[in-house]
Amino acid sequence: YFTDEFVEFYSMLQDKVKVKFEHTMDIIRTEYVLSTKFVKHLENKNLYEMRVSVNTNEYRTILFAVDNDNIILSKKVLLLNGFLKKSTKDYSKQIKIAERILKDFEL
């Protein structure tokens, strides 16, 4: 499942980046063991980050496991917002944005 914010972010990506995103989303959908190369649980949060690397660019998408606390066991995952990781400060800001989106989103 995608929020409008994620769809807007995704629509602006180059095709080669979209291919990497699709590959990572397929891994999340099909694998029972997820490497932190692709997905990482955010400390002290009920959120995860999807990690996509293209050349030297690091893209992140904040995820929420809708129907289970564990993303691997979840059948529904909501992609909240995506961004190009530039700094830790920007990263914290994006997590706050994701939390606001989740709060406003009706599950």
Each model region followed by its residue ranges:
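Basic, Lys/Arg-enriched alpha-helical interface segments
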Residues: 1-58, 69-76, 84-107
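Conserved catalytic cores of phosphodiester-cleaving nucleases, focusing on short active-site segments
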Residues: 80
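Short conserved beta-strand segments at catalytic cores or DNA/RNA-binding microdomains
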Residues: 64-68
